[in-house]
C-alpha cells in the first residue's frame, strides 16, 4: 500500500439538505483512497480524485484534526456549524482502513466531536472501530452515535471475492452485536 501525506484546505462538507439515508448534515473523509479494495466501490469507478491506484494507494490528510478543531469551534469567524450528525467515512475512503492504526485520525476526530458535542454516524467495514468504543459511548451519552456497516454478502466466501481487504462478514456481524450490547445504535446495508 502506498501512503501519501497532504495538507487539506478543509475537512467538513456541508450537505445542501440533511442526508435522508445517513441523517447527517455534514460529512468528512480523513483519508482519500481505500485499501479495502472492494471491487464494486463507486470510488474506484469515479476515481474520486485519488492519486495513484484506487484500492492500493491512500492519501492521508495529516492536518485534518487542526482543521476540524477550527471548523467545529463555535467562536469561528464564519457562521458556526449547527449541531447535527457528522457522517464519518464514505465512498472516498473508510475511516477505519488499515492506515488508521498508524495515524489515528478517526479517533482524534471523534474526541473533538465529543468535545464540541456533535453527534456522529460512522460508516465502515472494519472491526478496528471496536478500538474506539470508549469515546463512542461518551458521544452516545452526550449527543448520539450510530455505527453502520456495509456488506456485499453475509457469506464469507463471496465477500472475500468482492471485498478482499475487509474483515469477513461474520466478524462484522459480531462487531455490530458488540456495539448493540454497548448501547450504541447500529445498522447495516
Give residue ranges: language-model regions.
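Gly/Pro-rich active-site loop or hairpin
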Residues: 166
Amino acid at each position: 500500500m502506498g501512503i501519501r501525506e497532504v495538507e487539506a484546505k478543509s475537512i467538513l462538507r456541508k450537505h445542501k439538505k440533511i442526508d435522508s439515508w445517513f441523517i447527517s448534515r455534514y460529512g468528512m473523509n480523513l483519508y482519500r483512497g481505500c485499501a479495502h479494495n472492494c471491487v464494486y466501490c463507486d470510488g474506484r469507478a469515479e476515481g474520486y480524485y485519488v492519486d495513484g491506484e484506487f484500492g492500493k494507494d491512500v492519501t492521508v490528510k495529516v492536518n485534518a484534526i487542526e482543521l476540524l478543531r477550527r471548523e467545529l469551534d463555535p467562536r469561528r469567524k464564519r457562521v458556526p456549524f449547527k449541531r447535527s450528525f457528522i457522517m464519518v467515512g464514505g465512498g472516498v475512503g473508510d475511516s477505519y482502513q488499515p492506515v488508521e492504526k498508524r495515524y489515528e485520525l478517526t479517533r482524534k476526530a471523534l474526541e473533538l466531536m465529543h468535545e464540541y458535542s456533535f453527534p456522529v454516524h460512522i460508516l465502515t467495514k472494519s472491526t478496528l472501530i471496536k478500538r474506539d468504543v470508549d469515546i463512542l459511548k461518551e458521544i452516545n451519552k452526550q449527543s448520539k452515535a450510530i455505527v453502520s456497516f456495509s456488506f456485499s454478502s453475509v457469506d464469507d466466501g463471496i465477500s472475500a471475492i468482492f471485498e478482499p481487504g475487509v474483515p469477513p462478514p461474520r466478524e462484522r456481524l459480531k462487531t455490530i452485536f458488540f456495539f448493540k450490547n454497548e448501547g450504541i445504535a447500529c445498522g447495516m446495508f
